[in-house]
C-alpha cells in the first residue's frame, strides 16, 4: 500500500520582490533566519528597490551579533546574488566592501548576465553601480539608527568597520563619522 502526501520543502518566498509595506516584521525576521542560519533576530534591515539605469531589488540585514569569525580573512560574505529570482551565487564579495562582510541578505539584479564568472563579475559595470548604491544606503541606514541601536551595532561590528578607514579611501570620511572611541570623559 502506497500513501502519497504533499510536503512543502522550501516555504520561503522571494520577499525582496514585494513592496515594503506588504511585508511584515515577522516575515522579515523569518527570512533573515532562513538565509543567515542565525536564530537571533536581526538588528535592522534595509529593503531597497532601485529603478533607472541600474535596476535591482535588495534586502539587506545587519545581524544583532557579530559572527565568531568576523576577523577571519576567509569569512564568507553573506549576500546572495540572484537574477530574475534565479540563484546565481552565495557569498558574493563583489557587492559590498570587506568591512561590510557581516551584512546578510539578497540582491536580485534582472539585467545581470546569467553566464558570469567571478572574474567578469569584478569588472561588470552593473555590479559596480549596485555596490556603490548599496554602500551609500548602508551608510545612510547607520547614520539614521537610534543611539541605543547604534551602540549595539558599534559594540559588535565597530572594530571591523574601522578597517574601512584604511582600506576604502573613497568612503573613509563617512566611516570616520560613524567611528566611536571610548574616552575618560
Language-model-derived ranges and their functions:
Residues 1-185:
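Conserved GHKL (Bergerat-fold) ATPase module
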Amino acid at each position: 500500500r502506497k500513501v502519497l502526501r504533499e510536503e512543502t520543502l522550501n516555504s520561503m518566498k522571494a520577499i525582496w520582490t514585494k513592496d515594503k509595506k506588504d511585508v511584515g516584521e515577522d516575515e522579515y525576521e523569518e527570512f533573515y533566519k532562513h538565509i543567515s542560519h542565525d536564530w537571533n533576530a536581526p538588528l535592522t534591515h534595509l529593503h531597497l528597490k532601485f529603478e533607472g539605469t541600474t535596476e535591482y531589488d535588495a534586502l539587506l540585514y545587519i545581524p544583532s551579533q557579530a559572527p565568531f569569525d568576523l576577523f577571519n580573512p576567509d569569512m564568507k560574505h553573506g549576500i546572495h546574488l540572484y537574477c530574475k529570482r534565479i540563484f546565481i551565487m552565495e557569498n558574493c564579495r563583489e557587492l559590498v566592501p570587506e568591512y561590510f562582510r557581516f551584512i546578510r541578505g539578497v540582491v536580485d539584479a534582472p539585467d545581470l548576465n546569467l553566464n558570469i564568472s567571478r572574474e567578469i563579475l569584478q569588472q561588470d559595470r552593473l555590479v559596480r553601480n549596485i555596490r556603490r548604491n548599496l554602500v551609500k544606503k548602508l551608510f545612510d541606514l547607520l547614520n539614521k539608527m537610534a543611539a541605543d541601536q547604534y551602540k549595539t551595532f558599534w559594540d559588535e561590528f565597530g572594530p571591523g568597520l574601522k578597517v574601512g578607514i584604511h582600506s576604502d579611501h573613497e568612503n573613509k570620511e563617512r566611516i570616520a563619522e560613524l567611528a566611536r572611541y571610548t574616552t575618560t570623559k
